[in-house]
Amino acid sequence: MPEAFVPLTDFVNESKSTPRDHPLDKPVAKWVEEEVLDGEIVEAGVVILRTRGCYWSIKEGCSMCGYFNDTVPGGVSDDMLREQWKKVRPTLRGKKYAKIYTSGSFIDPTEVPFEFADEIMSDMSDMGIEKVLIESLPEFVNSKHFAYTNAPK
């Protein structure tokens, strides 16, 4: 690593080691914005679930973004993820499009357990959501991470 980057990496790693007092049962954020779906402008529900965050940031001390500030070292329990989901459902209800972010990778099973992801995909399908955009690093994109029981098409 070039010497000029060492102080930045050290700063980022030190910042990540400082505990933050985040409510584990509340998402980072939720809002509604316009999006295009099949050539039509629709309302999209956007949510950022609080998780342990990006494994690359944890593993290598990545300094590309500051999203680690919204994460929880050690992760969030399945029960707390479900509590967060209860709080974001009203933002998604009645929408055709959903965007799910985690400040990491939604389909990294060590960040978001597959069982939880499967539950919420089914819930979004039941709500009538037609399209879901998720955040992920490319190394997690494979068929086993998309083997949901019931998901929007």
Regions found by a protein language model. Give the residues of each.
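A broadly conserved sequence feature marking short terminus-proximal activation segments
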Residues: 1-35
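Canonical Radical SAM [4Fe-4S] cluster-binding loop centered on the CxxxCxxC motif
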Residues: 18, 22-29, 37-80
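Short boundary motifs at domain starts and secondary-structure transition points
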Residues: 34-39, 89-90
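Core AdoMet radical
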Residues: 66-84, 88-114, 123-142, 153
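Catalytic cores of alpha/beta
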Residues: 147
